[in-house]
């Protein structure tokens, strides 16, 4: 089992953002978190690499175990983030580094790869994500879709077991959205586990092998992709019809 959450409760000050979240996602699945604004999708995603710290519950992810009755050590959090990559909605590329430099920075510093090893790994990913012509460009000179592909390549440089996406197609036009969907589907063939937050039902339908539908910090429905054609709850049925 690649990801297991049990009884996760998360607060921002006095406001509770997640209520008793329990879910499983086997290795190699693509799990999509769906729901209206304020449902808790991004909070849940951020729990998976401990950008948000729950107040209670347990998390197993990529071989790392956390019991939130105790505060995790800095080393445990670092170990987790080596195995769990994140592609942010705003891309978060380093503006002063070229595409190639963006890719090799973390593997050299964090994984201790030599520059040659990192460059060889980067070369393969630039090829795979159709970014070869842009390797010497700076993020400022790339379109939104190109920046998103660089962000995905950068996360894959760490060879994570789990890859998290926060609204990967937000603000992208339909053609670029189709490219990102295609990349996610290609990655699904490689046995990497993916978790995707989106509010775009079509993106979810095209990528998800499992789906979790949330409202107001609660899981309302979860299951495999058949939920899209046979929703089990009125709430999810209504959401899909809008």
From Swiss-Prot:
Enzyme class of the recorded protein, top EC level: translocase
EC number of the protein: 7.4.2.1
SMART domains for the chain: AAA (SM00382)
GO CC annotation: ATP-binding cassette (ABC) transporter complex, substrate-binding subunit-containing; membrane; plasma membrane
UniProt record, GO biological process: L-arginine import across plasma membrane
Reaction(s) catalysed by this chain's protein: a polar amino acid(out) + ATP + H2O = a polar amino acid(in) + ADP + phosphate + H(+); L-arginine(out) + ATP + H2O = L-arginine(in) + ADP + phosphate + H(+)
A single MF term (Gene Ontology): ATP hydrolysis activity
InterPro entries: AAA+_ATPase, ABC_ATPase_HisP-typ, ABC_transporter-like_ATP-bd, ABC_transporter-like_CS, MetN_ABC_transporter-like, P-loop_NTPase
Keywords in alphabetical order: Amino-acid transport, ATP-binding, Cell inner membrane, Cell membrane, Membrane, Nucleotide-binding, Translocase, Transport
Binding-site residues for ATP, renumbered to this chain: 35-42
Membrane topology: Peripheral membrane protein
Compartmental location: Cell inner membrane
Keyword DNA-binding in record: no
Pfam families: ABC_tran
Keyword Transmembrane set for record: no
Record-annotated ABC transporter domain positions: 3-241
Function in brief: Part of the ABC transporter complex ArtPIQMJ involved in arginine transport. Probably responsible for energy coupling to the transport system.
Family: Belongs to the ABC transporter superfamily.
SUBUNIT field: The complex is composed of two ATP-binding proteins (ArtP), two transmembrane proteins (ArtM and ArtQ) and two solute-binding proteins (ArtJ and ArtI).
Protein name: Arginine transport ATP-binding protein ArtP
Organism lineage: Bacteria, Pseudomonadati, Pseudomonadota, Gammaproteobacteria, Enterobacterales
């Amino acid at each position: 089992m690649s990801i297991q959450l049990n009884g996760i409760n998360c607060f921002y000050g006095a406001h509770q953002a997640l209520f008793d979240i329990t879910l499983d996602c086997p290795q190699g699945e693509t799990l999509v978190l769906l729901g209206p604004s304020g449902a808790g999708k991004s909070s849940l995603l951020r729990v998976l690499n401990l950008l948000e710290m729950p107040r209670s519950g347990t998390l197993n992810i990529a071989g790392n175990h956390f019991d939130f009755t105790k505060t995790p050590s800095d080393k445990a959090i670092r170990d987790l983030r080596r195995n769990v990559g994140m592609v942010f909605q705003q891309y978060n590329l380093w503006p002063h580094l070229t595409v190639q430099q963006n890719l090799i920075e973390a593997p050299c510093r964090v994984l201790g790869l030599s520059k040659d090893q990192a460059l060889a790994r980067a070369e393969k990913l630039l090829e795979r994500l159709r970014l070869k012509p842009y390797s010497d460009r700076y993020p400022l000179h790339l379109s939104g879709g190109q920046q998103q592909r660089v962000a995905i390549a950068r996360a894959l440089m760490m060879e994570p077991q789990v890859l998290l996406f926060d609204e990967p197609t937000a603000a992208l036009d339909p053609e670029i959205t189709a490219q990102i969907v295609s990349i996610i589907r290609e990655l699904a063939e490689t046995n990497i586990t993916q978790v995707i937050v989106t509010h775009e039902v079509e993106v979810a339908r095209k990528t998800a092998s499992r789906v979790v539908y949330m409202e107001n910090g609660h899981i309302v429905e979860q299951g495999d992709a058949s939920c899209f054609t046979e929703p089990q709850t009125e709430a999810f049925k209504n959401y899909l019809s809008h």
